[in-house]
Each structure stands twice: as structure tokens, then as C-alpha cells.
Amino acid sequence: MARFFRRRKFCRFTAEDVQEIDYKDVVTLKNYITEAGKIVPSRITGTRAKYQRQLARAIKRSRYLALLPYTDKHL
């Protein structure tokens, strides 16, 4: 039986030496929200706690400014 090997999680922001996550960088922020619009937890993405807090703050700010949607569909 074949063994399944998981990809090692790492923090992209630490690897790229990012100081502050920008709320205007919508392309990056879209990678950290689900199709339903929820913020993906750090246990799935591998993001460090410091950057996860910055990420959540940036996503919430960009939602408030209508750069990102709150949900996938508005009925």
C-alpha cells in the first residue's frame, strides 16, 4: 500500500521576509480565503501566528472597503 506524504507547511511571509501585510494586495489575500469567503486557519496554511493576525486584519479591512467580498454570492 502506498504511503501518503504531506507537503511540509511553511510561512510564506517569513520566507519572503514580509514586514507588514497590505490590505490593498488583493491577489495575495485571495489565497487565504475560501470560496465561501471565510479566512483559512493557520493550521491549514502554515502561517505563523503574527502573520495570521495581520492577515485577518488585512482581509477584514479589504472587505470593509469592498476590495474583497464577504461571501461568494449575495442572494
Curated annotation (Swiss-Prot):
Ribosomal protein listed as a keyword: yes
GO cellular component, one term: cytosolic small ribosomal subunit
Disulfide bond residue pairs: none
Top-level taxonomic group: Bacteria
Molecular function terms from GO: small ribosomal subunit rRNA binding; structural constituent of ribosome
Cited SUPFAM superfamilies: Ribosomal protein S18 (SSF46911)
UniProt keyword annotations, A-Z: Ribonucleoprotein, Ribosomal protein, RNA-binding, rRNA-binding
InterPro entries: Ribosomal_bS18, Ribosomal_bS18_CS, Ribosomal_bS18_sf
Gene3D superfamilies: Ribosomal protein S18
Biological process, per Gene Ontology: translation
Coiled coil regions, renumbered to chain: none
Subunit structure of this chain's protein: Part of the 30S ribosomal subunit. Forms a tight heterodimer with protein bS6.
HAMAP family the record matches: Ribosomal_bS18 (MF_00270)
Function: Binds as a heterodimer with protein bS6 to the central domain of the 16S rRNA, where it helps stabilize the platform of the 30S subunit.
Similarity field: Belongs to the bacterial ribosomal protein bS18 family.
Protein name: Small ribosomal subunit protein bS18
Native source species: Photobacterium profundum (strain SS9)
Gene: rpsR
